[in-house]
Amino acid sequence: MSWWSEVPLLLATTGIFLLPGLLVALLGGVRGYPLLALAPALTVSLVSVGSIVAPMVGLGWIAGSVLVTVLACAAAFAASWWTRRSVTRRDQPRDWKYTAALAAAVAVAVVLIGRRLLWVFGEPDSFSQTFDNVFHLNAIRYILETGAASTFEVGRMAGNDYYPAAWHDMVALVAELGSAGIPVAVNAVNLFAGAVIWPLGCIYLVQQLFGRKSALVLLAGVLSAAFGSFPLLMLDHGVLNPNVLAIALLPVALGAAVNALGLAAEVSYPPLVRWLLLVAVSPGMTLAHPSTTMALLAVLIPAAFALAFRKSLKPADGRSPVHKVWPWLGVAAYIGVVAYLWTVARPVEAASTWVPIQSTGQAIGEAVTGTALGRPVTWAVFILTAFGLAFLLSQRGTRWIASMYLVLTGFYVVVSSFPQDDLRMYLTGVWYNDSPRLAALIPVMAVPVAAYGGWKLLDWASRLPAVAAGLARIRNKAAGPAYVAVVLVGAVALVGVSAYLTQKANIRQAAESAKRSYEVTPDASLISNDELELLERLDDEVPEDALIAGNPWTGSSLAYALADRQTLQLHILATYGDDVDTIYNRLRDAPADPEVCQAVESTGVDYVLDFGTKEVHGIDHGFVGLRDLEETGAGRVVDQVGEAKLYEITACR
């Protein structure tokens, strides 16, 4: 299987992510680059919310998504009509140079990130050999088989009432509409999220923060591909597939929030449209992973202060001086709401057991240099970030932007270096106290800060006498061939040099580490070559209605996702009853123990996958009852590849 054969699926994935959102945004009056940047976020919201609404109105989950899309289109059109003026013409690029810069920035980012991700994935049907992937892959199969795609239904697969399912919904939609296998659909969605949604959002955020500057968006495109901590880290650690989608959507949501607050460099939307856009993009990100929405709320605290400060400086115009107090009361109320949510929108403490990994000094160094988790320094990125931060802090009107960056780096410093006390639990327990999750958030603001630093340096260089004189001569040539040639050469040089200086060991090491997680080898941590070959034979050897037992820690539960055969436990940490416990611990004793056969009859188990004792985390959790079934007379070997065995239970017939 090659990626060339999957081009139709990749095109289908692009259409699935873009078309519904484009339709809603168009009817809402959005045009220009924001239309493209906002479309995927809108689509994810439509699909994930539609999956929740569908069972409430008696529809299938895909039909529910269509219904929500139709309703959103109607609402968008109504909002656009109500404002009674076009909000889009001002969003059109001002000249051909900026249009070309946007196109080049997106194209360069897609190529730089896309080629890394394709190399990491290897084959289109590869899958991450990590703990969390057992749940993620099986959840997609669960949606496809049951139609239960709601965030309040998917978790039931593992005994939970709630699990954010937006990522799973999008993969299931791609698998269903694109007629693709689950691993291929997973890789297609992650590729689109990392190589398309993420850079689109980064460029959009830079546009909202700093305005329309060609060099700035070019730098933003290149820099979106310059951090090993996203998207590569989230495809390596966990694997945290939902976080990949959620964090990829965060720059768009942050840009929409800045616009809604009226803090954007060029506010061209009426307030109603601005706030509706923010409301529309937020559900998808939240239902992908709510911790990312918590990050958004925290990062917006400096923006709230900036807004209050600006409003308090406005002249009274005959009003009572009390009007200057209201903005600050609003800030206090906002902080109160965020503080409350911080205490309730989090996992239980028992699940937040990750420990600090370094000293505070080292954590600060990693945060500001973009070298989280010990990656090498990319000096160009560090220098641009340092200059950008210095420039932003030196200007009163942009200090709030620098503060947003410091919020995210501060979280990383806390989680990776602070003592395991109540303060650390309160601040970073939202992310399970897991350093990689917070390391992945830093690029959200590091990209615009570094891009701004690069643009300011270029602006400074352009003011040097010799350079300024040369630029003046070029401008005097108007739009002639020589002028166009110089502009193109300059743009190519900027992109080429910045790409060369940023695609260094930081990215390479992150990619190499992630690639190891996707390799099927004889000693792979989850599924070995032999085990995968045996899973591929199940279609011919196990009836469709059969139930298979196995130690989920060894990857046997992936028979559900990869072979479409029901397994006794669909998630490694799923809860199970006494009968299942009896099978796991005593099935081998079935010939002499009537209680075992009662458990077999009660659960309906027919087969056992024995993948040995090698577990994904290198620990032995027992499951001794599933071993040596043929030797004890409890079962017979139906098939075997290497040490991987498929048993049929025969003792209880």
Stretches found by the model and what they are:
Residues 57-62, 124-129, 179, 232-245, ...:
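Membrane-helix boundary/interfacial segments in multi-pass membrane proteins
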Residues 46-49, 114-118, 146, 217-236, ...:
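Membrane-interface helix-loop junctions at the exits of transmembrane helices
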